[in-house]
């Protein structure tokens, strides 16, 4: 529980990508509750959400989903089947939903008004939800309680993500708490957003500095820019570097050329790792979606400064 009106229930799906698990939230009104991010299709978790609503003597009247990744959205359909509550999602959502939300739309159920705002970057179908009366900002995987999030092509976009962070910092200065998709609530929202922005810009500075000394491939760049993180995380780091490089190439700050050779085993391990050998099947599905492995890297490119 995080407050009288907002209650958190964390799914039992811990992993390197989900921290302790996916956070689902119930926002209570006098006559009903809204669920934000039902999480995975997990019977104990969905049953727990229903039980929490029953303890307040109210039904679940709506299900709002921040984005379509498999640790956030699959529980929506079975929860709808059990409660009859409509599912609200982004216009670009690739999962079944009843109501499409545009930027600034309001979910108005009884005395709960939840505004939706587009928040691309981590995913192209991402929304955040604003409970203005409580100063509560529900950020899904845009901002989490601990660490940072993965921005990976093809559905992740680094420039869109930075724009989203700036928007959240500048337009939601009244926020008293951020409730992320993973980890604990953030009680100093502006400080956290400043930290996130500074972190992304520093990684970009490190990337450009590494390229200033000559052309390099992404696996080579990983060992330089992310030398401070565990090798286990290098595949995720590689995808984030790809997001930076796509943006920088679009802005004519770097150039790329394809090397006419196959990926080496070490390069393949970083660019297209075998997730099934690293984590359990459920965690592998989440990681594949987060890291964009439905779009594998099948060629090696070398990048340089313009």
Positions of predicted regions on the chain:
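Conserved beta-strand hairpin/beta-sheet module of binuclear metal-dependent hydrolase folds
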Residues: 1-56, 128-140, 145
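Residue-level signal for inorganic ion chemistry
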Residues: 5, 49, 182, 207, ...
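Active-site HxH/HxHxD metal-binding segment of metal-dependent hydrolases
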Residues: 20, 33, 40-115, 135
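Metallo-beta-lactamase
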Residues: 32-35, 40-43, 113-206
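Histidine-centered divalent metal-coordination motifs
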Residues: 66-72, 122, 182, 244
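Residue-level signal for the nucleotide or nucleotide-sugar donor/cofactor binding architecture
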Residues: 74, 156, 236
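Short hydrophobic/aromatic-enriched beta-strand-loop microsegments
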Residues: 84-91, 138-140, 196, 231-233
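C-terminal regulatory/interaction regions
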Residues: 209-306
């Amino acid at each position: 529980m995080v407050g009288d009106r907002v209650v958190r229930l964390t799914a039992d799906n811990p992993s390197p990508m989900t921290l302790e698990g996916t956070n689902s939230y119930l926002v209570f009104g006098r006559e009903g509750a809204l669920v934000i991010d039902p999480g995975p299709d997990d019977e104990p978790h969905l049953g727990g959400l229903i039980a929490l609503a029953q303890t307040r003597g109210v039904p679940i009247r709506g299900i709002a989903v921040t984005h379509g990744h498999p640790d956030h959205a699959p529980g929506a359909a079975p929860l709808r089947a059990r409660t009859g509550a409509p599912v609200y999602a982004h216009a670009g959502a690739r999962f079944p939903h009843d109501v499409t939300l545009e930027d600034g739309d309001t979910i108005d159920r009884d005395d709960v008004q939840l505004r939706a705002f587009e928040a691309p970057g981590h995913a192209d179908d991402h929304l955040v939800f604003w409970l203005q009366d409580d100063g509560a900002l529900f950020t899904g995987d845009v901002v989490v309680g601990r660490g940072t999030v993965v921005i990976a092509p093809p559905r992740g976009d680094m420039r869109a993500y930075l724009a989203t962070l700036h928007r959240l910092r500048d337009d939601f200065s009244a926020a008293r708490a951020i409730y992320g998709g993973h980890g604990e609530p953030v009680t100093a929202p502006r400080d956290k957003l400043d930290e996130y922005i500074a972190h992304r810009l520093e990684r970009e500075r490190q990337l450009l500095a590494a390229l200033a000394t000559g052309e390099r491939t992404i696996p080579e760049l990983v060992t330089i820019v992310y030398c401070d993180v565990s090798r286990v995380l290098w595949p995720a780091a590689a995808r984030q570097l790809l997001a930076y490089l796509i943006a920088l190439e679009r802005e004519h700050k770097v150039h790329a050329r394809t090397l006419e050779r196959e990926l080496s085993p070490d390069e393949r391990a970083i660019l297209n790792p075998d997730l099934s050998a690293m984590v359990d099947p459920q965690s592998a599905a989440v990681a594949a979606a987060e890291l964009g492995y439905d779009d594998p890297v099948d060629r090696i490119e070398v990048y340089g400064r313009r």
